[in-house]
Structures are given as structure tokens and as C-alpha cells.
């Protein structure tokens, strides 16, 4: 978003560096939905982080060379498929209307751990819309 609004190449470089860090992290699960902390594999997954990553990758794919763009779109699609599975997506009419379960807000304080969180739904819908609008 910073690059889109400013055109400052430093923002694009930082976004690419962040994306590469995430996608190449040895503790990133195969389905693309990260643990609440990359340094704590095997603990709770964080659907909200997955949704943010998917949305960010799809936006970033608009500003990078074609091959890199394809890689980011594939990674975002993998995350969206995972989040759309029964593991993360709540059944209609359940979970008080939340779309996604299994998000983490503040694990060190024991707050919002393995629960639905509204911003997870927001970024999930944003990512789905971005994916749908791909050329």
C-alpha cells in the first residue's frame, strides 16, 4: 500500500523482502497458514496472519516482474484454498457469524488465542476480492 500510494521504490523493496522472508521461512507450513509465531512451530496457527499475507501478496504481485508475480499469486492462492477449507472456514450460521476460526490476537498475554477475529475476516474477504479481480 505504501508503494502504491507514494511510488517510493524503497517501500516496494521492503515489501518484496518481507514477502520473501515469509515464503522462504523454514517454519511456514505447507498450507501457507503460519503459526502465530514463526519461531514456535507446532503451536497455534493464525488464520488472520494467513489472510493478511494472502492479501498483501496479491497486491504486491501487481508491482513485481512477471515470474515473481506468478509466484506470489500461487502462494496467495494456496493460502486462500487453505483458509476456505473446513479446517479454517466456519459453517454458515455458526461462530456468531465469523467466517474464519483459528486466529491469534495476543498469545503472550493469553488473549484471543485460537478464536475468530474480525480483522481475519476483513483481510480474507479483501484477498478473495483481489484474487477474483486478477487479470
Question: Where does each model-flagged region fall?
Answer:
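Glycan-recognition and catalytic cores of secretory/periplasmic carbohydrate-active enzymes
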Residues: 1-135
Amino acid at each position: 500500500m505504501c508503494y502504491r500510494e507514494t511510488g517510493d521504490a524503497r517501500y516496494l523493496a521492503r515489501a518484496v523482502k518481507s514477502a520473501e522472508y515469509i515464503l522462504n521461512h523454514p517454519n511456514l507450513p505447507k498450507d501457507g497458514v503460519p503459526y502465530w509465531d514463526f519461531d514456535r512451530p507446532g503451536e497455534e496457527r493464525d488464520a488472520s496472519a494467513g489472510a493478511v499475507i494472502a492479501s498483501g501478496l496479491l497486491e504486491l504481485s501487481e508491482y513485481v516482474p512477471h515470474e515473481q508475480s506468478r509466484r506470489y499469486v500461487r502462494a496467495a492462492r494456496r493460502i486462500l484454498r487453505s483458509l476456505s477449507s473446513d479446517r479454517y472456514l466456519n459453517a454458515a450460521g455458526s461462530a456468531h457469524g465469523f467466517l474464519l476460526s483459528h486466529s491469534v490476537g495476543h498469545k503472550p498475554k493469553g488473549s484471543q488465542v485460537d478464536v475468530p477475529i474480525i480483522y481475519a475476516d476483513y483481510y480474507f474477504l479483501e484477498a478473495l476480492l483481489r484474487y477474483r479481480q486478477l487479470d
